[in-house]
Regions:
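N-terminal signal peptide c-region/cleavage motif recognized by signal peptidases
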Residues: 14-16
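Positively charged n-region of N-terminal signal peptides that target proteins for export
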Residues: 1-4
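Generic recognition of long tandem-repeat/solenoid scaffolds
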Residues: 67-77, 114-119
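Residue-level signal for mature regions of secreted extracellular proteins and peptides
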Residues: 7, 42-43, 110
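C-terminal partner/receptor-binding element of secreted or periplasmic proteins
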Residues: 96-124
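Short Fe-S-cluster ligation motifs
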Residues: 70-102
Length: 124
């Protein structure tokens, strides 16, 4: 019985997670929507940055010691975290490999405040 549970758990973990589009990107150009939908967590490359999180603009950031601190600068479709909130970003949640076509820093934060990904502001 334990082997079945272990096998089932491993099989489910191997399935790529799909990003959640709650309509927050429908006004965006197709290329930007696709970028959001395919953005994967740096430490879990089969799990979407936004599968269980909400995206916030974080155009400002600071470096404190050895990690980034993202600063919420605007809301997207959600407004749970107030503008100006400083969010410490663990180094393993920094997303460097997918570019950033939005021109904005984007941080994905879960309902319990956990950071899934942070993409620093980039050029369009």
């Amino acid at each position: 019985m334990h082997r079945i549970i272990i096998f089932a758990t491993l099989a489910l973990a191997a399935i790529p997670a799909l990003a959640r589009d709650g309509g927050q990107w429908e006004s965006q150009p197709a290329a930007i929507r696709q970028w959001f939908l395919t953005l994967m967590q740096p430490d879990h490359p089969r799990v979407s940055c936004c599968g269980e999180a909400d995206a916030y603009e974080a155009d400002s950031f600071e470096v404190e010691g050895d990690h980034y601190v993202a600063i919420i600068t605007a809301h997207r479709a959600v407004s749970i975290i107030p503008i100006g909130t400083r969010v410490p970003v663990p180094n393993h949640k920094m997303k460097w490999d997918s570019g950033n076509p939005t021109g904005h820093g984007i941080i994905f934060v879960g309902t319990q405040g956990q950071v899934f990904c942070y993409v620093t502001p980039g050029g369009i």
